[in-house]
Amino acid sequence: MINKETIENVKAVQSSYDEAPYKSKTFYYTQPGRQQMVLKLLGFKTPDLENARVLEIGCSFGGNIIPFALENPKADIIGIDLSGVQIDEGNRIIEYLGLENIRLIHQNVLDFDDKLGKFDYIICHGVFSWVNEEVQRGILNVIKNHLTENGSAILSYNTYPGWKNLEVARDVMLFRDEMLKNRGEQINESNAVKYGRGAIEFLSQFSMLNEKIKTGITGITEKDDYYILHEYFEENNQPLYLYNFNKMLLEHGLIHVVDSDLMKTFPNISNEIEEKLTAECGNDNIAKEQYYDFLLDRQFRISIVTHEANKEKINISKDVRITDLKEIDIRGKYEKNKDGFYTIENNEIKDEEVSLILDILSENYPNTITIDELEKKVREKNKLETNNVYANAVYLMYGKLVEAYSRKLTVKKEEKIKLNPKYKKYLDYFITNPNPVIALASYEGTINYDTINPIMLSIMTLFDGTRTDEDIFNFLVEKEKAGEVVITFEEGSSKEEVIKNNIEICRNFIEINFLNK
């Protein structure tokens, strides 16, 4: 039986998201492919993606799962959300795209329909910290009872200690709104953020708070209004310490395995600190991660979760086994500076082997290459029997310097490239909707394109399998001459150069994101 307070709380949340919806994006670190890759790296095999059953709790308009549905037509995807407004619009988008393997349901997670069955991958992003404890436990019950034996789930949530700094910003915004209400001002969702921004801008400029807190407050002012409204003005915002979060999981027969952002579980810290933590925590990975959060002031986590019974099957360790590394696929594209060195995070790469790895990845891009294949290529080129390819690959993955996948991805090279019809419909949605409610996403959501150039998208739709790049160039030149297309260009360039450059960009986008598969 749902208690009365929770019913009222749920109604408030539903009303908030109906009245002030926000753009639904694709979050890379929540994707089933990311979950599978991370767990594969740790020696644990999750179900195949192609035929997976996927559930998203709090799916909004479906922007996080629609790309997965497009990529995996044999998969079965379901999203649930409290907001009927967002569910209805999301289903209209799905119908427009012609997708039959995904549906969105207007449903409270506390009333979850058991007939929906079991799921191989469950996503719950941007929900857990923003509901009360009864709903949190309801979410965990759904995961426990509806996750397949070797399945995995994603739960994201705000964390302490980092959020203690941000609570100052939340408190001052809520304080100002309450003060103005008491003076007779009409405060509602349409103006609450405006007044809140004023309060934190004042703090940012004049406060005696320490610089770290002031920096965090200043960062809030750069966020969109809808983000600030739901992040800082919701009735519920309950950050958690990781160890308390894991206690809740254990009560439901679940465990935190690692953070989907591996650097949060295996940070790059000094050997001295690592040795002290190992002496303190032993094999208790949760305790060690909690210390990392204290040391690094973490404010947000994306936990990969599975059944507690699976713990012994997973190598939860910074020391990844070579057998697990071999079949991970990676890709990346890198540029050298004027001195002939690769530059990563403003550091010149002078290590010969790392430079060779970046050479090979760049030559192979946008195709992926397994780390086993990479190691063999390095041996062939440097003529040495021993190398550090596996260690360097881990460094690149943990540092988010390569894209990593659980399956091989190969670009289909064609002179007359053909955009897959399902992706043409996807692009058409953004071309015909000046204010789309979902974000255009790259493959697996590594990038969300908030600013969309409809002309560029229209050029992409010209790759229909009947035209070469030159044919498209000639077509656009004629359209420009007829006044049907407007080409803007800077001084020193020509319309023809701009058109050719745009065609190349569009071809690369299609190939890099496998839109012609």
Q: Which ranges hold each PLM region?
A:
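Conserved class I S-adenosyl-L-methionine
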Residues: L155-R183, G196-Q205
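Conserved alpha-helix/loop element of class I SAM-dependent methyltransferases that forms part
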Residues: E19, F27-A52
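Conserved SAM-binding loop of SAM-dependent methyltransferases across substrates and taxa
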Residues: F61-K74
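Long, charge-rich, low-complexity alpha-helical segments
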Residues: P267-N310, T343-K517
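Conserved SAM/SAH-binding beta-strand->alpha-helix loop
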Residues: S83
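A short glycine-rich, Lys/Arg-flanked "PGG" loop and its adjoining helix->strand segment in the class I
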Residues: R137-E149
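Conserved SAM-binding strand-loop segment of SAM-dependent methyltransferases
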Residues: G98-V109
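A short acidic, Gly/Pro-enriched loop at the edge of an enzyme's catalytic core
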Residues: D114-Y121
